[in-house]
């Protein structure tokens, strides 16, 4: 099958078909669909029309997309608020929609502690300083703030390695 060149005329509704194909893989935000369809060479007017049709059919919903993304990143992957907000911004979710979705994320300190507890048991009890540094680095890389990460790591290591001295 030949690939269609970008400058050739496309059949009416091709943008909508492509968008449906993208949505069949996973939920996407309005901005993400717009970017992908324009990059594929579709006319901006056709892209806008296709996305509006999909929104009216309930297949494109930024609020639902944001809630799903927050649930995935915050609850299942145990990511911090900064990482989740960054992901929402990268997907083109509006700030007000992102803020509403973030309300359901739960307590960031609890998520940081859950992540730290999950990993603390794997660390060597003979080297508490190294264990703290490794655990702290992991928690911060997941998007938690330094103070939240510090407290979560200290508590998780106290529980996992009670005989070790607490790092400074």
Place the predicted regions along the sequence by residue.
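An alpha-helical, amphipathic repeat domain used for nucleic-acid recognition
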Residues: 1-168
